[in-house]
Structures are given as structure tokens and as C-alpha cells.
Amino acid sequence: MRRLLSLPFRLLRNILRRLMLRTVADMRGGKKQRYAKEALLRDVHEYTAVWAYLVGAAFLFMASEMALLVPTIAWTGSAIFLYRAWVRGCHGYYVASYQRNLLRLPLYRMESRALRQLKNQFVGMGFQWKSIHAQRLYDIELHKNERFTRFSGSYDRARDYCSRQHHGLFARALARYLDSDSLLNPWRPAPKLEGKAWLHTVGMPEGEQPIYQPLPTRVSHTIVFGTTRVGKTRLAEVLITQDIHRGDIVIVFDPKGDRELLLRMYLEAKAAGREDQFYMFHLGFPEFSAQYNPVGSFLRVTEVATRIANQMPGEGQSAAFREFVWAFVNQIAKGMVLLGRTPSYPLLKQYSADVEPLFIDVMELLYQRHHYDYRKRLAEFEAALLMSAEDRRKAGFNFTIPRAMNDRSQRGKAFWLLYREVGDKLPLTMTERDVAMSMMKAFQTDASYMAKLVASLDPFLEKMTTGAVSRLIAPDFSDPTRDVFSWTQIIQARGIVYIGLDALSDAEVAATVGNSMFADLTSVAGRLYKHGADHGLPAYPKSGYQPKICLHADEFNELAGPEFVPMLNKAGGAGVQVTAYTQTLPDIEARVGSKSKAEQMLGNFNTVVMLRVLNESTAKLLIEKTNKVNVSDIATFSGSSDNPDLTSRVRFRATVQSREVSQSVELLRTSDLSKLPKGQAFALLDGNNLYKLRIPLLQYDAREAVPNDIAAVARAMEKNYSNSPTNTDWARYQEYLREDDIFADGTYSSMQDLCNNYLRELDSDTFMQGQAALMEAE
């Protein structure tokens, strides 16, 4: 109700503010600056002239006879005085608003529906950072202008009063008043955005503009840097919302698990009419998650071994053992594919422990496929294996079994002997013969010796097949209640996929599954790149919009691996546009193992967005791409000298000089990036043009119904992944949602009742908007 009553006052204030700033802009537009130095950090002397003009206008209007003027002339003079008062007032407001915004900027909120019809990619409100902004920033940081960057003493005392406990009725009421965001409160608290607000204020005199990223440039990939809790995920919400409503294929990797991001994706998919295309894969909630096989889809069978071997250590002597792992897994994968079995981690674990069952199945298939009656001869070999060496010679069997095969079964040995005898005579294809030779080699190798060579494979497979995670990455196609997806299916259906990797619980499994998914997606992208965008896809009408594959990778440093390099290098031709979010450059270096590999990855990102970063090497990625500019200051020199001529009437000479002194500085400094408030960023767009951005905090138009499974996951994510110190951060929705959980525990007759229950907790106007939205949806 309080907001509703203050709405007319806020509206009137905004109208007057825009009108006054427009007046100043019209008067300044197209004119050269009158003075060598812009003077925005000074006392607002214009208001004195405004009062003088107003008094003169009132005097001429009400007492023209005392000015000895006829009323017509007096009223004309009064109108001129009023006009001059307006002009000088606008100039004064221009300076005063600039100084006021040095300490506080209002929160930038936006309704998500405003992003649903944009042709280009909106990244925020801001301006292009130029030399004038570096000049203003230089002026602000001068010691003589320090008073403009400090709050008043009364404001500090008000904040100190609100921070203490109060027990009296009047004291508590006063604390609530001083802590309220009301126009009637001259000491209302500044938004808790941290950082230095003037980094954005320096561009406010010219005004903010919507900053867009042209869609064709997105295939050259984007990387977003920012330290913890400064707005990376909120920027991701802005970009993902537009991708969903544009009809693109959206794939989001979220290692840590962000509740608001999951809800945002589902609600925007529902608003776009794409609810049926939404899939959720979450390692932390297997009971609600869709299923996916990381090694079940491939273009070449060798990709299975590559995806697994890439998870093995490959530095130093470990590189040789990784090659053994690759060869062993490749042998198993070839046998499974020949049998028509889809590779999966549980099956790979089973056959890596004992390859004999796979060997027997492959041999039986080959004999049956080529109509060879092997059973009689196989039985003879089995019987011969039970004989002594002398009896075998008498029976006409002249063979020896390698010592490495002593632990194998009699049936397996019989198949091995049979293939040695008749293998060359069978009309096998090249592929079949290759698989048969691989199986023979794997079978006759000493199991204990092979176990030592591929010792690093067992821990990896244990990670991937332990607990409930194994049910997610080994899909059960006979279960009708669980969705199973593949990347080809997602691309065909223009799907929207949220992938929660639960890295806070198990970072190793999260990284492994994420890398396997990347490798699978890279394979699919390679197929599209070679055979065209329509390969395996429905025939889209040529006049329609060709959907892109929008890949968003939060906490990119936890997912970066060898699989990511070919995706960045070549997948742009298949329509894959990657947006990666990470904290620092050293995080990526630590993940990939070297600085050169990290730079190889970063060289493929043409668009860089940098929120607050504290690491100097990370900040230099942006700083080194900007040029130097000249900033100026007015230096005053004074001096005096005595006149030695005693006969002259001039006893001394005094001089005062003002000089404009310039110096070369960086257009942007590393220290500026460490002082950015939350939700603000610098970005290199459109060919290394530097922009300063404010990222909007998206608001829900009204809470819509959310399915029970997604609601349960959201509740658990809020409980398990969040902690109380961050609940007041800018990067959360506490500004417009109450602290109560959006999904209250209890039983509801319908999802509409759940939605209504939440909306009743909001103010009345929001509740009415929500009711109207629900009725319109019905």
C-alpha cells in the first residue's frame, strides 16, 4: 500500500527529472564545450541565481507599479525571469544529480517480458567508455574532490543508529523510518551494491542507452569474468531468457546449482510455450532428473575411448598409461558396438573387470552371422582342454595355451582355439575381423598385467557407477516415467536443457560428467559442421529462423578440458555459440594444467564481459586491449618578486598563472575493475569497443505454477546450496520477494492454489496482477 501511495510522487519526480535533463541536453547538444575544463565537482551556484530570478519574477508580476512598468511589460519581464530560472535550475540540477549519483545509483530492475521480443542480444544499460569518462574518473579521485565521494555526517549517524538494537517504541519506529526507502526520508539507505558507484556515474550526464550484442557475433563466443556473488548468474538469466524466447536451442551447465536459474529457465520456457521442450538433468536429485548416457552417442566408436581416456592424468609418465587405457577401452567399445549394445559406464566397468563374457559373445555372433557350425568343434576343444598333454597329442590336438590364459574358463579358451583354427577361413568383413583381433588380444593378455596398466581406469569407473548417479548415466529405456535425452534429440526438438552437476557435493563426478557431455556435444556439432545444419534434423523452412545452439557454461573453470578446445575452435560453423562464466584466469590455468592451454582457450572468445575481479592477471585481459588517453588538470602557479629600482613606484611584482597540464593514462585501470559494484561490468563488444554496463535484476511478472518435481528440486537447492550470509546479496530476489519460501510446504488441490497462496503474501497490486495473468492463461 505504501508503494501504491508513493507511485504518483515517483512518477512526477521522474517526469520533471527527464524534462530538466532533456533541457540541458538540448542546450548543450551540437555545441563545443565553452571551457577547457568541465566543472561538475563544485558547489551548485546556479540555485542562487534561480532564487534571484524567482524573486524578480514574483516582484514584477505582483508589484509592477513599484518597478515603474506597465503591467504588460512587467509580466513579459516576469516570464523572461521564469524562463531564466528554469534554464539555470536545469543546469543546477544537472550538476547536483551528477554529484548525488556519485554515491548512490538506483537498483536497475526489469520485467522479463521486456526481453521477449528483442532482435539483438540485450546485455544491459550503459554507454561506450571514452576518454571523457576517464577524465571524469580522474577528477573524482583528486584529493580536493574527496568531499563529493563521502556521505554526509548525518547520513553516517543515521546508519549507525539503525545498526543498533532499540527496545523503546519510539526508538524502533525511528529506526524503521531511517531505514526505509521513502522519498520522505532524506537519509534513506543506499542500495547494498558495494563498490564505487561513480564508475557508472561518469557516463550518466550523457545518459544511458540499451547496449546490444549483434546476434551474428555470438558464434565467436563470449566469456564472462567476475568474482563470487557479483552477478554472473544474473547476467546469465538475462541472456538465457532472450535465447529461450528467440526459439534457440538452450543448454545450460550449472555446476554449483542455482535455484533461481532453474526456476527462471522453466518459467521462461513456459511463457514462450516451450514447456514440453524443457529437460532437467541434475546429479544431486536423481529421483527427479532426466537420464542421459555420456558415452552412448558417438559418430566414431573411438570417441568412447577418447572421452574416458581424457579423464585420466596425462602429464609425465602418466601419458603412457593413459594410452593403455584408451586402447583397452577401445577394444571393449568395439566389441559392444558389434554386438549392438550401447556403451555405458556400468557395462564398461563390467567388461573391464572381466573381458571374457564379451569375448565369448563376440565370437558366437561372428560364427552365427556367417553360418559356421561351431558347436561340435567347440565341444571337442573343451573336451581336449580337460585332457592331459599326452592324451591331447594322442587325440590329434597339437596346441598349447599361453600361461597368461591360465585363469580363463574352458569355454573361453575353446573359443580362442577355435578362432585360431578357422578365423582366417571365415568371410569376415574388415570391421568384423578388426573387432575379432582386438577381442583375441584382450582375451589372451594376462588379466593381472592389464589391471596394472589400466589401474587408473578403475577409480574413474567407480566414481561414475556408485550410488544414484549410475541410474542417470545408464538410462533405463523401459521406464516410462523417466525422460531420456540425447543431444541429437535435443537439437531436433529445439530443446531447453538445465544440467545441474552438483559440484558442491562431488566435484570429481561433476567435472567428469560435464566433460563427457561436452565431448558428446562436440561430436554432434562436428556432424552438423560437416554435413550441414539440416543433417538429421527436420527440414526447416528457408524463410524461417534457423535456431542456434546456445551453450551457457557457468563455473566454466570446473568444466574446461580437452573436449572444450575443438568446440570453441570449430563448433561456431555448426551454429554453437558458447557463453562461459568463470571467476579468474588462474582458475582456468589450474584446471587445464598450463597457462598456454588456458590462453589457447581464451583466444577463441571474441567478446569479453568483466564484472568485479580482484585478480590482476584476469583484469589485464581487458586492460591490455584498450589504448591510452590524455587527461588534463588545471595547475595554478603564483609568484612574487621585489623591484630593485628604488626610484620606481612599483615596489614588487606578483604573478598568477593557470595552466592546463595533461598526462597519459590507461583508458581503464585494473583498480577500476576491482571497485565495480555488484551487477555492473565492462564489456568489449563490436570489435573491441569498450562499454560500461549495468545488468538488470529480472523480476517475475507473477509466479506461475511450477511442477512438483521442479518445485521439490528448487526447495532442496535453496536449503542445501544457500547460506544465510548471501541472502541479502544483490544477486538474489529479496528486493521484491518476501523471505518466505516460494513453495510453502503443504498439500494443495492444484498448482493454481499454490500460486495464489504465494501471491497473497505480496502486496495487493501484485496479487491482482497475478490473478489477471492466471485468468488470461486459463
Where do the model's predicted regions map?
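P-loop NTPase motor core of the ASCE superfamily
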Residues: A39-V44, T76, G316-K334, F485-Q489, ...
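Short acidic-hydrophobic sequence patches enriched in Asp/Glu that either
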Residues: Y94-L102, G257, L261, E563, ...
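P-loop NTPase motor domains
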Residues: L16, M20-D26, V202-E206, L215-T228, ...
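Basic- and hydrophobic-enriched, low-structure N-terminal and domain-boundary segments
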Residues: M1-V230, R234-L239, E287, Q657, ...
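Short acidic/His/Gly/Ser-rich catalytic and metal-binding motifs that mark active-site loops
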Residues: S289, I588-E589
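Conserved H-loop
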Residues: Q583-D587
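Hydrophobic alpha-helical segments involved in membrane association or supramolecular assembly
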Residues: T72, T76-I80, A511-D520, T607
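Short hydrophobic alpha-helical runs that function as membrane-insertion/retention elements
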Residues: I249-F253, Q277-M280, Q577-T582, V608-R612, ...
